[in-house]
Amino acid sequence: LHLCDRRQRQMCIRDRPVIEAHPEYEKQAILERLVEPERTLMFKVPWMDDNGQVQVNRGYRVQFSSAIGPYKGGLRLHPSVNLGIIKFLGFEQIFKNSLTGLPIGGGKGGSDFDPKGKSDREVMAFCQSFMTELCKYIGADTDVPAGDIGTGAREIGYMFGQYKRIRGVYEGVLTGKGLSYGGSLARTEATGYGLLYLTEEMLKLNGIELAGKTVAVSGSGNVAIYATQKAQELGAKVVTVSDSTGWVYDPEGIDVAALKEIKEVKRARLTEYKNYRPNSEYHEGRGVWNVKVDIALPCATQNELHLEDAKQLVANGCYAVAEGANMPTTLEATEYLQKNGILFAPGKASNAGGVATSALEMSQNSERLSWTFEEVDGKLQNIMVNIFHNLDDAAKRYGMEGNYVAGANIAGFEKVVDAMTAQGIV
């Protein structure tokens, strides 16, 4: 299948019971059709920097699958971006979007442009040039990109403005927009809140209450902050957060207001946290997974939780891990946690709250409505609870009860394949 990435091979292996149970899939070449994008776009992005020099970056949009709805997936702006990374992320996005139960297909895009160190004018120049080409291939009912690494509210705003200027229409062609021009309430909180809604449901099904439990969270960005906030609202105690230089241990529970001020207002390092909570400890480097906790929520970055970390969590009596970041747990660590009976919620399910709320933003845009925070949050909670029950049911149907990684892959896969089968060979 020409899938060089180990995670894609793992997914195909986990879906083998489904394929064996449906010989018609092989006859229709479902896998061969699924792993090839419907469309791959690659284009130059010329723009002028503040010194009057013309710069050229490369832009990408991989429109992977529209079997269940318009292509949906973020735009990543980072020097590491290449076609291989975008294709892999787009492939994963198909199944994450499918799990939400909402009518959204899978796609991904981006550029090797680095917004760090660039002026606002340079970022605007790049975004306008990028959208000048991309606008030919996207639309509210065709392909709806969103933010990702390097693409925040500023970049989305510049891209939306250029799309509107060229196409002459005001439509929900991007999500993650500002509230003043079609964005959704609760979008900022969605991934972190959704993580806790799914984690709570996973624990509940296994006879465990979230309230009263001790939680380790890694990261201190958007997902980590709102995961911490929601965990403490639900009665748990979060005792750690981290950033790229070190981590904080607060035995009394992380002060979310202090964390927000440090990270969202001051944009400072966690070394300042001790100024707010004198009884807390700051440690340089890694080590957040060495703390004895009941639940671990990796919310920082890809491949942050290694095999040795998994061994430490098991030794310390941790009994649940749910991924808040995209693929933060290595394959070896995931397998070790599962073999040792740890409840493990994979990111394609547990951090799907962000894309789910993006789809809710699309719904509001199409209806020309703006829902209240409580309305969006209530819909998000229902979506996350349903995601968990769908993956749990899928795992049970194929004799893999408790294997939520396999359950998530199967549940996402089945919906897409059913749609592909119904629509014929297209």
Regions found by a protein language model. Give the residues of each.
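Rossmann-like adenosine-cofactor binding region
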Residues: G246-F344, A349
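Short, Gly/Pro- and small/polar-rich lid/capping loops
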Residues: Q10, R14-M42
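Glycine-rich phosphate/diphosphate-binding loop of Rossmann-like nucleotide-binding domains
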Residues: T175-G178, G183-K292
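Glycine-rich, N-terminal phosphate-binding loop and its surrounding beta-alpha-beta segment
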Residues: E32-P115
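Single conserved hydrophobic/aromatic residue that forms the stacking wall/gate
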Residues: L1-I13
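Adenosine-phosphate binding glycine-rich loop
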Residues: R6, M202, V314-V426
